[in-house]
Amino acid sequence: MGWLVLAAGQSRRFGADKLTAQMRDGRALLAHTLAALTATEQPLLAVVRPGHNAVTALLDRLDVPYTVCPHAEAGMGASLAWGVSQVKDWMFCGVALADMPYIRSGTLAALHERGGEERIVAPFYHERQGHPVIFGRRFYPQLMALGGDAGAKSVLQRYSDALLRLDVEDRGVLCDVDTPDDIHEARQEGVAYSLS
């Protein structure tokens, strides 16, 4: 098992490269996301877009392997399909979004413990489904068939009988960063506990 980190987005709403944007401690947003994932002691593979040199340089510094998705501009579905095609030997993979730096490592460990080849595991915070989502190898063909900007929602809906809910008290599973204000709002709401 390992974590597939989707880091190939364009950051259009952020207005700059959000993955290398500095958090309050001076580290990059992506570094925070990766720190929590690394704490689970599971393999990581980041999916990046061609020419995203600032992100690949950061991944090199952090010693995180990555794969360049040649069709990343097509959207998240294309990046996810490409990433899954690179980790077909994993019994299950956690699909993590690079712009979600507030998830507790304990939540990630609990998700990992429940993963399996035949199931999907998703965190829920107060009845709202969050990220990351773990997919067993059974679902890799469906994930590899995705394209465009459609993420894994269709797979989740089609195989809802295989979904294992993990209720968590971790609002970070819902908090992504799309704009600079998202970082400020998360701090105001006390979500930034993982930024120590």
Predicted segments, located by residue:
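Phosphate- and divalent-cation-binding pockets in alpha/beta enzyme and binding domains
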Residues: A54-A57, Q142, D176, E185
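Nucleotide phosphate-binding site architecture
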Residues: S11, A21, Y140-P141, H184
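Structured alpha-helical
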Residues: G136
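Nucleotide and nucleotide-moiety/phosphate-recognizing core
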Residues: M1-A98, Y102-Q129, D161-V168
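A generic structural signal for short hydrophobic patches within well-formed alpha-helices
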Residues: L108, F139-L143, A152, I183
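Conserved alpha/beta core of the MobA/IspD/sugar-nucleotide pyrophosphorylase nucleotidyltransferase superfamily
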Residues: M1-W3, G147-S196
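Residues that recognize and position ribonucleotide moieties
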Residues: P101, V133, D176
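Glycine-rich phosphate-binding loop of ATP-grasp-fold ATP-dependent ligases
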Residues: Q129-H131, V173-L174
